[in-house]
């Protein structure tokens, strides 16, 4: 009679291997996240503008105007950081799950810098901004609930 124990353990080990690979990718992203902000041409702009952004409501007209003043640094930042939808020609549709998870963690941490920050409001704003599908939006919301 067939005993599934061996095949099941083999499968469990294989899944564990793949999860460990993703764990390595996530660890690398954590180490390198936004490192480009620490060097020219981004650092000078972020030194000047970040304190202003922290006092503004995310997504407000004033926030958008302030971002517009950073375009050179932002373009460099987006080009060098694939957790931003702007990095890709087709935005989020070109991202992988590691990119999306880093993006979500970035949005959560950024929302905490604003005096009136709220990750759920940020998700709503970014849902419209980046054309996030209902299904992905719900997955992002479910994931934020874990933090």
Each PLM stretch: what is its role?
Residues 1-147:
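Metal-dependent phosphohydrolase cores
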């Amino acid at each position: 009679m067939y005993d599934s124990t061996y095949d099941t353990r083999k499968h469990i080990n294989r899944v564990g291997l793949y999860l460990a690979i993703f764990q390595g990718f996530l660890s690398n992203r954590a180490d390198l996240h936004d490192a480009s902000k620490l060097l020219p041409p981004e650092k000078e702009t972020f030194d000047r503008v970040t304190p202003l952004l922290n006092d503004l409501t995310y997504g407000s007209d004033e926030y958008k105007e302030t971002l517009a003043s950073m375009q050179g640094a932002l373009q460099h930042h987006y080009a060098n950081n694939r957790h931003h939808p702007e990095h890709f020609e087709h935005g989020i549709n070109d991202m992988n799950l590691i990119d999306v998870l880093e993006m979500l963690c970035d949005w959560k941490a950024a929302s905490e810098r604003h005096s009136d920050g709220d990750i759920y409001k940020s998700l709503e704003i970014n849902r419209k901004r980046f054309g996030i599908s209902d299904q992905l939006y719900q997955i992002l919301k479910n994931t934020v609930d874990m933090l």
